[in-house]
A protein has these predicted regions:
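Active-site loop/lid in soluble adenylation, ligation, and acyl-transfer enzymes
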Residues: 1-61, 68-69, 75, 188-220
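Residues in well-ordered beta-strands of folded domains
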Residues: 9, 28, 37-39, 47-49, ...
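Short terminal or interdomain "cap/linker" segment that borders an active site or interface and mediates
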Residues: 13, 133-166
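Short connector loops at helix/strand junctions that flank enzyme active sites
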Residues: 43, 61, 77-81, 139, ...
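Short, acidic Gly/Pro/Ser/Thr-rich loop/turn segments
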Residues: 45-46, 55-56, 91-93, 159-160
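Residues forming anionic-ligand binding surfaces in small-molecule and nucleic-acid pockets
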Residues: 70-93, 165
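Short histidine-centered catalytic/ligand-binding loop motif
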Residues: 85-103, 167-173
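Long, positively charged amphipathic alpha-helical accessory segments at protein N-termini or as interdomain linkers
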Residues: 106-134, 157-220
């Protein structure tokens, strides 16, 4: 398994796109153990990678909240998906693994959990030719595929403090048991907790001063 212990947060109350990104960054700043966070979105949203050009997505502001991620990758529609983040502090042995190893390990865990739930999927053997800036239009190696369609993708960022992996599973209605099986495939020791007020307070600052600002949204 990837970890010995794993903290799991189930965010029951959907929040804004900016706050979702801010919570992930705050967890990366302060986590002392690996954390798996599942969360939802207050409104239909679109997140796009750090280097994405806002002008390409500006028209979506009429119907969706837009947010620039701290991680890379393409654009992702949110609302009916299951969104998650994995935070690995630099102090954890798993942080020594490269990004492709972690990517494959997480998507392998998703594949195995889905199979137990009755949905057979495969990991993509190779990257497909890029056809757009939409994440789910462009399978890369080890993405989760179902009936020829990419259903799980992710983006990553590494800092001195650790590793952030933000993922989306585009299968509406995934059960609570799927989340439990996904987490159990990553570590033998699972601890389910709520996010601390310290993290939420820090996230509120990051949302107000970074992710919710026009400067950040229009960065490129």
């Amino acid at each position: 398994m990837l970890f010995d212990r794993l903290i799991v947060h189930h965010d029951r109350a959907p929040t804004s796109a900016a706050m979702n990104m801010a919570i992930d960054e705050a967890l990366l700043e302060q986590a002392t153990l690996p954390v798996l966070r599942f969360y939802g979105w207050r409104r239909p949203s679109l997140s796009f990678g750090y280097f994405g050009k806002f002008a390409e997505f500006a028209k979506e502001t009429k119907t969706r909240e837009l947010v620039r991620r701290w991680t890379g990758g393409g654009s992702v529609w949110h609302g009916e998906d299951l969104t998650y983040a994995l935070i690995t502090p630099a102090s954890d042995p798993a942080s020594a693994h490269g990004p492709t190893f972690i990517y494959a390990a997480l998507h392998g865990a998703i594949r195995d959990a889905l199979l137990i739930e009755g949905t057979e999927t495969q990991l993509a053997a190779d990257a497909a030719p890029k056809v757009s800036d939409a994440c789910f239009a462009n399978p890369v190696r080890d993405d989760v595929m179902h009936e020829g369609r990419k259903i799980a993708g992710a983006a990553q960022r590494r800092t001195r403090g650790g590793f952030l992996h933000q993922g989306s599973i585009q299968l509406p209605g995934l059960s609570e048991s799927f989340r439990d099986r996904f987490a159990a495939a990553l570590a033998p020791g699972i601890q389910q907790t709520s996010i601390s007020m310290q993290i939420l307070d820090r996230a509120a600052i990051l949302a107000a001063e970074k992710y919710g600002t026009m400067e950040w949204l229009h960065r490129w």
